[in-house]
Amino acid sequence: MAGWSCLVTGAGGFVGQRIIKMLVQEKELQEVRALDKVFRPETKEEFSKLQTKTKVTVLEGDILDAQCLRRACQGISVVIHTAAVIDVTGVIPRQTILDVNLKGTQNLLEACVQASVPAFIFCSSVDVAGPNSYKKIVLNGHEEQNHESTWSDPYPYSKKMAEKAVLAANGSMLKNGGTLNTCALRPMYIYGERSPFIFNAIIRALKNKGILCVTGKFSIANPVYVENVAWAHILAARGLRDPKKSTSIQGQFYYISDDTPHQSYDDLNYTLSKEWGLRPNASWSLPLPLLYWLAFLLETVSFLLRPVYRYRPLFNRHLITLSNSTFTFSYKKAQRDLGYEPLVNWEEAKQKTSEWIGTIVEQHREILDTKCQ
């Protein structure tokens, strides 16, 4: 494969940064363009240290700015699109999520057509498949099964519609007469160092005398380590550029998991943090059906108050379902088509994440000490 270049959107994010760091190791890669709305100074510094034989160009711009996207895509061989707004709690306005996740993806696809970019990889989410009910069990699901989210909540809806747009764009004619080839990856819940979700869970625990909050004690999920997710994107980029592999990948979606044990979200948080003295919440909690209907009542109150007051419930039905379902998927199709095998095993992933959590605990030790006095 001749020299090539790659644009990564959301490059300052949890997954995007890992993809950038892996990409610069790719053979024949001449340039990586890292695009995000804003980069933290420390991220820019880390990227500057990656400057080897591969040029790393940092671009700050809005996914909703069509001209910015067109400039970013000029001369690019592959786009890896990870930029997204993730919110399942109702903090971020619905329209903002739809604009970034759906319209932003549509803008980027159009920029690829105009700039004649032949390959597009979308970082989707398992949320596009559900779960739709905590009562329905999905164990080791796969792509041939018809799993599709029916939620109207902005995050799963926007990601679902964006993925549909990406896969529908496969085969589109480019401005230079070539063809756009696309695929989508659906990672499970992603954990690892710098996970914003784990970071928030640890900070909440430190403010609660070291007791981890109950978020999903009834769930059975198969979390995936961030480095393995990034690796799957690298393999997809290789595959779409390889004429021998590309035909089986074009227009396809893939569940991305690894060998992390199936467990509840609460068990995962505890397993990763127990070495640092954090412990699970042993207090009694409401039965799941009652929690679900309470969420419905809170959503109803929020809807009725909307004309005069913006009330955000502490939890909603989608969050309750997401956090308390049995919902796991196999990576066999990615293994078959992309040659995907997890780079990092569970023990190593657990150790790396736990060590990172340890640094958070030490940095914020005064919170725990104050709360325990």
From Swiss-Prot:
Identify the GO cellular component terms for this protein.
Answer: endoplasmic reticulum; endoplasmic reticulum membrane; mitochondrial membrane; mitochondrion
- Kindly state the tissue distribution recorded for this protein: Steroidogenic tissues (includes testes, ovaries and adrenal glands).
Residues annotated as binding NADP(+) are 10-15, 155, 159
A GO molecular function assigned to this protein is: steroid Delta-isomerase activity
Reaction catalysed by this chain? Answer: a 3beta-hydroxy-Delta(5)-steroid + NAD(+) = a 3-oxo-Delta(5)-steroid + NADH + H(+); pregnenolone + NAD(+) = pregn-5-ene-3,20-dione + NADH + H(+); 3beta-hydroxyandrost-5-en-17-one + NAD(+) = androst-5-ene-3,17-dione + NADH + H(+); androst-5-en-3beta,17beta-diol + NAD(+) = 17beta-hydroxy-androst-5-en-3-one + NADH + H(+)
Q: How does it sit in the membrane?
A: Single-pass membrane protein
| Cellular localization per UniProt | Endoplasmic reticulum membrane; Mitochondrion membrane
Kindly state which keywords UniProt assigns to this record, in alphabetical order. Endoplasmic reticulum, Isomerase, Lipid metabolism, Membrane, Mitochondrion, Multifunctional enzyme, NAD, NADP, Oxidoreductase, Steroid metabolism, Steroidogenesis, Transmembrane, Transmembrane helix
Active site at which residues?
159 (proton donor)
Q: Which residues cross the membrane?
A: 288-308
Known InterPro entries for this protein?
3Beta_OHSteriod_DH/Estase (IPR002225), Lipid_A_modif_metabolic_enz (IPR050177), NAD(P)-bd_dom_sf (IPR036291)
What does it do?
A bifunctional enzyme responsible for the oxidation and isomerization of 3beta-hydroxy-Delta(5)-steroid precursors to 3-oxo-Delta(4)-steroids, an essential step in steroid hormone biosynthesis. Specifically catalyzes the conversion of pregnenolone to progesterone, 17alpha-hydroxypregnenolone to 17alpha-hydroxyprogesterone, dehydroepiandrosterone (DHEA) to 4-androstenedione, and androstenediol to testosterone. Additionally, catalyzes the interconversion between 3beta-hydroxy and 3-oxo-5alpha-androstane steroids controlling the bioavalability of the active forms.
Record-stated family: Belongs to the 3-beta-HSD family.
Put simply, this protein is called 3 beta-hydroxysteroid dehydrogenase/Delta 5-->4-isomerase type 1
Q: Which organism is it from?
A: Mus musculus (Mouse)
